[in-house]
């Protein structure tokens, strides 16, 4: 196995395992809730749902709720997969495995505290945007920029790989 294939497989395994660690509890929760509550098309007039006018995929939520759930799970899978792969980049900066393991959480939570408490920008926090019903059409560009930033940080791992010896 070449060094390039090894690091690519390491990245893919980390991405998939983190995405599954985020999505499996959501799927289990959905199945448990479906055992007790009826599944049906949500009615906008009741006002019982967090998806309101201006949310991304609001029409999908009210017309095709299962498709909305699938989109929500894919979004969560990708977001937390990218977030956890930051560990692979930070392994070159820090030698302590415990600190490397905590790096995604520390960055995720400190970004939330800095933006919400420090700057008062609640709509820009990745933690707040993790719930898709908090993503509005007018701030979708903020989410795309943050996900692109996570992707760029993850790609730094592959830049460092070129000079590494297996």
Language-model segment annotations:
Residues 97-111, 149-150:
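Central hydrophobic cores of alpha-helical transmembrane segments
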Residues 112-135, 139-156:
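Extracytoplasmic/secretory soluble proteins
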Residues 1, 85-94:
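Generic transmembrane alpha-helix motif of multi-pass integral membrane proteins
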Residues 37-51, 106-122:
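Juxtamembrane non-transmembrane "cap" segments at the membrane-aqueous interface
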Residues 89, 93, 148-166:
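Junction motif at the cytosolic side of a transmembrane helix
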Residues 1-11:
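Interfacial "coupling" helices/loops that link adjacent transmembrane helices in transporter permeases
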Residues 21, 25, 29, 33, ...:
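Structural signal for membrane-spanning alpha-helices in multi-pass inner-membrane proteins
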Residues 11-88, 127-146:
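Secretory targeting signals
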């Amino acid at each position: 196995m070449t060094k390039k294939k090894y690091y690519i497989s390491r990245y893919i395994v980390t991405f998939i395992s983190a995405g599954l660690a985020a999505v499996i509890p959501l799927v289990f929760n959905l199945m448990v809730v479906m055992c007790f509550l009826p599944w049906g098309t949500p009615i906008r007039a009741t006002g019982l749902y967090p998806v309101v006018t201006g949310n991304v995929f609001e029409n999908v939520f009210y017309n095709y709720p299962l498709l909305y759930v699938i989109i929500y799970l894919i979004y969560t899978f990708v977001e937390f997969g990218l977030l956890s792969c930051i560990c692979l980049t930070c392994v070159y900066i820090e030698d302590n495995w415990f600190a490397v393991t905590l790096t995604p959480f520390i960055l995720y939570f400190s970004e939330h505290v800095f933006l919400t408490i420090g700057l008062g920008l609640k709509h820009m926090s990745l933690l707040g945007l993790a719930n898709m019903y908090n993503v509005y059409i007018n701030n979708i560009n903020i989410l795309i920029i943050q996900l692109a930033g996570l992707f760029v940080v993850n790609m730094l791992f592959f830049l460092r790989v070129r000079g590494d010896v297996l």
